[in-house]
Amino acid sequence: MSGEGENPASKPTPVQDVQGDGRWMSLHHRFVADSKDKEPEVVFIGDSLVQLMHQCEIWRELFSPLHALNFGIGGDSTQHVLWRLENGELEHIRPKIVVVWVGTNNHSHTAEQVTGGIKAIVQLVNKLQPQARVVVLGLLPRGQHPNPLREKNRQVNELVRAALAGYPRAHFLDADPGFVHSDGTISHHDMYDYLHLSRLGYTPVCRALHSLLLRLLAQDQGQGIPLPETAS
């Protein structure tokens, strides 16, 4: 992608502490410290959609048995995840899979820039954890009614899916089970604020992801279970 070196979405950047309470950096330091005595099979990293998943029963049902770690921080964009990865969040562990779900908060960036940021994350994970597979979850539609951000997220997904074709250990999963109804609306039962998932909304997303994770883990153990069609 031309101009990617100047892409703000792919430049590792810490969050500016506008509120002045240091919470973002405190969470980052906690993630680094918590990982020192863990042996996770799977690590999740991303924004609030990752962070809030940890509070749902389905996390305990599906991902706790995989000794999964959750490094989600609300409000993060791609450049923030890159900074966290460059500053130790994967330093003390050797996961088999890293799940990345970020990009919907890159409001001021183009679809091409967001794609560059996600691709930079995949490249960095490959460098830091060459044994690990990377699963990138597609961005979800957002807003009760059709809007430009929803369309941009759709464009990002198309671009990311194509970009990841060049990375043999990276996989794209369309995380949307069909949240947009035939009239173009999204229900508050699935996304309570038309951005964040409800417990009901998390269920199909997590089950599809869990199915893919099990297949990837089995493949790496030589069992050869085929990948689902939604993953590439």
Swiss-Prot record:
GO terms for cellular component: 1-alkyl-2-acetylglycerophosphocholine esterase complex; cytoplasm. Its EC number is 3.1.1.47. Keywords: Acetylation, Cytoplasm, Hydrolase, Lipid degradation, Lipid metabolism, Phosphoprotein. Residues 1-20 are annotated as: Disordered. The modification N-acetylserine is found at residue 2. The modification Phosphoserine is found at residue 2. The active site is at 48, 193, 196. Forms a catalytic dimer which is either homodimer (alpha1/alpha1 homodimer) or heterodimer with PAFAH1B2 (alpha1/alpha2 heterodimer). Component of the cytosolic (PAF-AH (I)) heterotetrameric enzyme, which is composed of PAFAH1B1 (beta), PAFAH1B2 (alpha2) and PAFAH1B3 (alpha1) subunits. The catalytic activity of the enzyme resides in the alpha1 (PAFAH1B3) and alpha2 (PAFAH1B2) subunits, whereas the beta subunit (PAFAH1B1) has regulatory activity. Trimer formation is not essential for the catalytic activity. Interacts with VLDLR; this interaction may modulate the Reelin pathway. Originally the subunits of the type I platelet-activating factor (PAF) acetylhydrolase was named alpha (PAFAH1B1), beta (PAFAH1B2) and gamma (PAFAH1B3). Now these subunits have been renamed beta (PAFAH1B1), alpha2 (PAFAH1B2) and alpha1 (PAFAH1B3) respectively. Belongs to the 'GDSL' lipolytic enzyme family. Platelet-activating factor acetylhydrolase IB beta/gamma subunits subfamily. This is Platelet-activating factor acetylhydrolase IB subunit alpha1. The lineage of its organism: Eukaryota, Metazoa, Chordata, Craniata, Vertebrata. The gene is Pafah1b3.
